[in-house]
Amino acid sequence: MAISRGDKVRVKRPESYWYNEVGKVASVDTSGIKYPVVVRFEKVNYAAYSGVDGGNNTNNFAENELEAV
C-alpha cells in the first residue's frame, strides 16, 4: 500500500477528528517516524482561537490508518 504525495486517502483512525473524511496527501516522510504521512483536508477542525475563524486543516497519520480512495 504505497501512499504517495497527491493521493486521495480516507482516514481510518477512530479517535481522529477527520475519521472517515477524505483528504489529500501533502507529504510522506521516509525517515522512520511513527506518523509519516501528512494529510491536508478541505475543512478545518475546532483548534482555533476564540473569536477567530480557522483551525488546523492538516494532520499526521501512519500508513495503516489510511485507505486509498
UniProtKB/Swiss-Prot annotation:
Gene3D superfamilies in UniProt: 2.30.30.50
Cellular component terms (Gene Ontology): photosystem I reaction center; plasma membrane-derived thylakoid membrane
Protein topology in the membrane: Peripheral membrane protein
Main location: membrane
Transmembrane parts of this sequence: none
PANTHER family linked: PHOTOSYSTEM I REACTION CENTER SUBUNIT IV A, CHLOROPLASTIC-RELATED, PHOTOSYSTEM I SUBUNIT IV
Primary role: Stabilizes the interaction between PsaC and the PSI core, assists the docking of the ferredoxin to PSI and interacts with ferredoxin-NADP oxidoreductase.
NCBIfam families from the UniProt entry: PRK02749.1 (NF002745)
Protein name per Swiss-Prot or TrEMBL: Photosystem I reaction center subunit IV
Source organism of the structure: Prochlorococcus marinus (strain MIT 9211)
Name of the gene: psaE
